[in-house]
């Protein structure tokens, strides 16, 4: 008997605690975590600096709403803007889908403020941007739409790495192009440097906002603080969440100064967004991730080479956001790995996705590879 709605196809295990890169079930069995709560636990589990900061904040102040000044928001926003390509402003939300919704609203508001009727968006096939109506409409996967139609009007889907398909969808009412530079849920599909360069040119040429969904790729996951930095892009807006709080729910959008000005009092908001606890968590995560970036690149390259050596499929991704595309469905392998104490994820049917904590070491990767070699 359960009192929970049947939303999730849960695996047959109950975790009761975590430490570092490991989770432990009710029986005390140890599991090597290469999922990180779907890219959330950037610093692993029970990371001492994060744990201590949260304990201190809980005893001080949890929530005040956005009716008042919030120094914790200011501190975290400054740290996020510091890594942006230009001066910008931050709006805080609670999740990835809320961040994408905020980006959509901001883009429409920006063009309305400029007196232009630009309200449409182009996103990409196999993309995933969230499950609330705006972000769901931006998601280029019909399986997520089924049963929830009609969707929000104005969204169309181009093919990743096919610039002609983007041109075909563009018109004078296009407000923004929304893209993940590496699609996560869609199968760890990377946009090419040439394609992204041309996409940037289109946005500039056609007066369209470039919105990058960094919910999964951001905050050090790919070896750069923001994944767009691999490609020398200059986005107008980026959406953040997942790894930013290290396990505490938080989302954010970061927009360049001119675009950000379109959010004015009453235009958009959030009761919980940017509460002191979440922002305190985010501040610790950002400080630690800044120091971890060279490590993420090093162990990410090591992991990628080890996956290639398996010779079992196409290896995709960057840093510690990697995928192994198999020739058959991968759901069974997730269960086999679970039995052997390794947590991995199957996405897009045939892609094993790996999102370990950013603190992972080479010996952990060796252990994971050993399990993969055995089960594959």
Swiss-Prot record:
N(2)-acetyl-L-ornithine binds at residues 131, 270. CDD domains: OAT_like. Keywords: Amino-acid biosynthesis, Aminotransferase, Arginine biosynthesis, Cytoplasm, Pyridoxal phosphate, Transferase. Its main location: cytoplasm. It is found in: Cytoplasm. GO terms for biological process: L-arginine biosynthetic process. This is Acetylornithine aminotransferase. It comes from Aquifex aeolicus (strain VF5). The gene is argD.
């Amino acid at each position: 008997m359960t009192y929970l709605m049947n939303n999730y196809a849960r695996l047959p295990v109950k975790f009761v605690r975590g430490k570092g890169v490991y989770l432990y079930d009710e029986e005390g069995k140890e599991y090597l975590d290469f999922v990180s709560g779907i890219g959330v636990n950037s610093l692993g589990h029970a990371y001492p600096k994060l744990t201590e900061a949260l304990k201190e904040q809980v005893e001080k102040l949890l929530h005040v709403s956005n009716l008042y000044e919030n120094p914790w928001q200011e501190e975290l926003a400054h740290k996020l803007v510091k890594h942006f390509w230009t001066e910008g402003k931050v709006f805080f939300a609670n999740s990835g889908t809320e961040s994408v919704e905020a980006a959509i609203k901001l883009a429409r508001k920006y063009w309305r403020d400029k007196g232009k009727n630009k309200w449409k968006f182009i996103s990409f096939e196999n993309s995933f941007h969230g499950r609330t109506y705006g972000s769901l409409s931006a998601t280029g996967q019909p399986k997520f739409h089924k049963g929830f139609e009609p969707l929000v009007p104005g969204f169309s889907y181009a093919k990743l790495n096919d610039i002609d398909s983007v041109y075909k969808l563009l018109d004078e009412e296009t407000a923004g192009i929304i893209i993940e530079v590496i699609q996560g849920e869609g199968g760890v599909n990377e946009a090419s440097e040439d394609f992204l360069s041309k996409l940037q040119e289109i946005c500039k040429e056609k007066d369209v906002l470039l919105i990058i969904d960094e919910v999964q790729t951001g905050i050090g996951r790919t070896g750069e603080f923001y994944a767009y930095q691999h490609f020398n892009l200059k986005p107008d807006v980026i959406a953040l969440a997942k790894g930013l709080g290290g396990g505490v729910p938080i989302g954010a959008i970061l927009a360049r100064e001119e675009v950000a000005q379109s959010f004015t009092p009453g235009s958009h908001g959030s009761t919980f967004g940017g509460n002191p606890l979440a922002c305190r968590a985010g501040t610790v995560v950002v400080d630690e991730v800044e120091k971890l970036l060279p490590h993420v690149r090093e162990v990410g390259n090591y992991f990628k080479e080890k996956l290639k050596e398996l010779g079992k499929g196409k290896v995709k991704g960057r840093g510690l956001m990697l995928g192994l595309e198999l020739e058959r469905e991968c759901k069974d392998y997730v269960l086999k790995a679970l039995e052997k104490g390794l947590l991995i994820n199957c996405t897009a049917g045939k892609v094993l996705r790996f999102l370990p904590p950013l603190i992972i070491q080479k010996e952990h990767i060796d252990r994971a590879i050993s399990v993969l070699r055995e089960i594959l």
